[in-house]
């Protein structure tokens, strides 16, 4: 039987599954739409599609390293309860192992890449959604490489609510690298050093501080000096090397790193759900939405 566009459209409307999944299911069932629906349900595709419009803002981060390669990833679920589920934890580890080995460059490339079991990452996640019963997404990941004379530092806070992977060059001291990662988790700097702050951002802050000083009635001849002092505090807030080290506030991070003749190559910090707008459902509306299903 010929698979028409109308038939594919009808199956999409009934299941919410993607066009190619619908076309494939119809082909396999010789155009029988009821059997195609059952097939999509069996594969978990219809179930996953129905959850696609939900918001997944909970979840966990995870970090794995192997030799000179490291990966940090964030996988989201709808609830914190599911994030603690054994099936979710297994999925998180499987994805981390795969990303570490495959080293895809983008989320799209990651989704399309084949895992050891022969399924793509996207299919593997879809299968997990069918078993676990919540929307799950691989939100982001970073694959980082280092030289032999360098150290990875990884730190997970609150069981993975915040994850940081840092790289220190010029040293193989993993304990120091972990301390730097812990500092980044706690303080959340925007930059490694002040030379990474754009001139535009620095000038904007300088202008704000100048206006504040003038409004405080400070004499113009000392405003410039005051502004530079306050600008240094601004850099201390946003630049890792200028910050007081969390384990010893009497020292700056740059002093701690320099003592080992090391430098900070990079760091990646993920906090679960940051930047995702969580939907606030009213309880009555939630009940009605369940009744209507």
From Swiss-Prot:
InterPro entries: EF-Ts_dimer_sf, Transl_elong_EFTs/EF1B, Transl_elong_EFTs/EF1B_dimer, Transl_elong_Ts_CS, UBA-like_sf
MF terms (GO), sorted A to Z: translation elongation factor activity
Coarse class of the protein's main subcellular location: cytoplasm
UniProt subcellular location: Cytoplasm
Sequence segments annotated as region (Involved in Mg(2+) ion dislocation from EF-Tu): 79-82
Record carries keyword Lipid metabolism: no
Source organism superkingdom: Bacteria
UniProt KW Protein biosynthesis keyword: yes
GO cellular-component term (any): cytoplasm
Keywords: Cytoplasm, Elongation factor, Protein biosynthesis
CDD domains: UBA_EF-Ts
Pfam families in alphabetical order: EF_TS
The family this protein is said to belong to: Belongs to the EF-Ts family.
Function noted in UniProt: Associates with the EF-Tu.GDP complex and induces the exchange of GDP to GTP. It remains bound to the aminoacyl-tRNA.EF-Tu.GTP complex up to the GTP hydrolysis stage on the ribosome.
Alphabetized PANTHER family for the sequence: ELONGATION FACTOR TS, ELONGATION FACTOR TS, MITOCHONDRIAL
UniProt-listed HAMAP family: EF_Ts
Name this polypeptide is given: Elongation factor Ts
Organism: Bacillus pumilus (strain SAFR-032)
Lineage: Bacteria, Bacillati, Bacillota, Bacilli, Bacillales
Gene: tsf
């Amino acid at each position: 039987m010929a698979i028409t566009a109308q038939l594919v459209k009808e199956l999409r409307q009934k299941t919410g599954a993607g066009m190619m999944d619908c076309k494939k299911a119809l082909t396999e069932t010789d155009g029988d739409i009821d059997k195609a629906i059952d097939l999509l349900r069996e594969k978990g595709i219809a179930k996953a599609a129905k959850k696609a419009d939900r918001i997944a803002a909970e979840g966990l981060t995870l970090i794995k390293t192997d030799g000179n390669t490291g990966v940090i990833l964030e996988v989201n679920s709808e609830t914190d309860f599911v994030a603690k589920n054994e099936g979710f934890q297994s999925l998180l580890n499987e994805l981390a192992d795969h990303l570490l080995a495959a080293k895809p460059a983008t989320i799209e490339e990651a989704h399309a890449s084949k895992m050891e079991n022969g399924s793509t990452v996207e299919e593997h996640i879809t299968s997990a959604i069918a078993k676990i019963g919540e929307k799950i997404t691989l939100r982001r990941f970073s694959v980082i490489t280092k030289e032999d004379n360098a150290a990875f530092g990884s730190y997970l806070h609150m069981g993975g609510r915040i994850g940081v992977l840092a790289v220190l060059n010029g040293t193989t001291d993993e304990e120091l690298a972990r301390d730097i990662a812990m500092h980044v988790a706690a303080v959340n700097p925007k930059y490694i050093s002040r030379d990474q702050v754009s001139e535009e951002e620095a000038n904007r802050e300088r202008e704000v501080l100048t206006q504040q000083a003038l409004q405080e009635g400070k004499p113009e001849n000392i405003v410039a000096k005051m502004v530079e002092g306050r600008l240094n505090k601004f850099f201390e807030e946003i630049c890792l090397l200028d910050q007081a080290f969390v384990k010893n506030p009497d020292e700056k991070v740059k002093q701690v790193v320099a003592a080992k003749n090391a430098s900070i190559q990079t760091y990646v910090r993920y906090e679960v759900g940051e930047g995702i707008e969580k939907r606030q459902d009213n309880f009555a509306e939630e009940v009605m939405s369940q009744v209507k299903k």
